[in-house]
Structure formats: C-alpha cells, structure tokens
From Swiss-Prot:
Substrate binds at S9, K41, L73, K87. It comes from Acidothermus cellulolyticus (strain ATCC 43068 / DSM 8971 / 11B). PANTHER family: PHOSPHOPANTETHEINE ADENYLYLTRANSFERASE (PTHR21342:SF1). Its EC number is 2.7.7.3. GO terms for molecular function: ATP binding; pantetheine-phosphate adenylyltransferase activity. This is Phosphopantetheine adenylyltransferase.
Length: 165
C-alpha cells in the first residue's frame, strides 16, 4: 500500500489545503492528514475541532484518514510506515523553507517529500489570512468549506465559544 502524509496546523483548513489533499488522495492508496499539536502556538480552534473540520471536508475521500501529532513529523511517519510527506508550494518563498525541511526529514529518517504546486486560485491563501479577513467581517466563503465558515463565524463573533485546549 502506497502511503503519504499531508501535515499542517489546519487552523482552519482552507480550500488550498483541500486541493493538495484531494490531489494526494488521487496519487496514494492512503493519505493521512496529520494535524499538528503545538502547545507553544495559540490556535483559534482546538486540535479536536481542527480534526473534525478536516474530517468533514474530506469525507468524500475514503482513503483519507485524519490524526493529530506532536513532535517530529518523521517520528510520526516512521511509527505508521509512511515514506512520503506531501507539501503544497504557493510561492518560491515556500520552497526555500520547505526544501530545508525536506532535506532534514530525509537525513533523519529517509522520508521523502513530494512538492505539489498550489492551484493558482489558492496561491495567496493561508489560514492566517482567512482568520484575519474574517475577523474584520470580510467574505471568506470562497476560501474555506461552508462548514468551516460557520465554525469560524461562531468562534470569532461569539466570545463564549473559546476552544478547548
């Protein structure tokens, strides 16, 4: 079975993420979406909420599974027998950082990295940008799935709905 992982914080998952995940699902027998647990970074959504959003958004792909991870991604890969990391590249600036990470991951554990160029429709898109625009009342409906947009509006405009960290 050919396996790959698509890692990220997915806070929240965007249509750009989903483009990469769907393309990975077409290339591999099993794609694990690995949602990062980073206690040093304050996320808008808890890891459980982010995993739920990714599961909802990828429900049409039977070969996509969603898990969380902390620590080194290569340790996560090694424990699950995943030999390939899939990363989307939006711009040359992404490549500079991701190439270093790919080389380190290969050096540490022999894990390969496959770079997919982002669909030009999403080349500017990031979770941070979505959150910022939404916080100011901007329309992000074409950038994220509807279910994510509903959760985002609730989180941003209903202060009683803090994440469970």
């Amino acid at each position: 079975m050919r396996k790959a992982v698509c890692p990220g914080s997915f806070d929240p998952v965007t249509n750009g993420h989903l483009d990469i995940i769907s393309r990975a699902a077409a290339l591999y027998d099993e794609v694990t979406v690995a949602v990062l647990v980073n206690k040093a970074k304050r996320a808008l959504f808890s890891v459980e909420e982010r995993m739920d959003m990714v599961r909802e958004a990828t429900a049409q792909y039977p070969n996509v599974v969603v898990e969380s991870f902390s620590g080194l991604l290569v340790d996560f890969c090694r424990a699950r027998g995943i030999p390939v990391i899939i990363k989307g590249l939006r711009a040359v600036s992404d490549f500079d950082y991701e190439l270093q990470m790919a080389q380190m991951n290969h050096s540490l554990a022999g894990v390969e990295t496959l770079f997919l160029s982002t669909n030009p429709l999403y080349s500017f898109l990031s979770s941070s940008l979505v959150k910022e625009v939404a916080a100011y009342g901007g329309d992000v409906s074409t950038l994220i799935p509807d279910s994510v947009a509903r959760r985002l509006r609730t989180r941003l405009f209903d202060p009683s709905r803090e994440p469970d960290h």
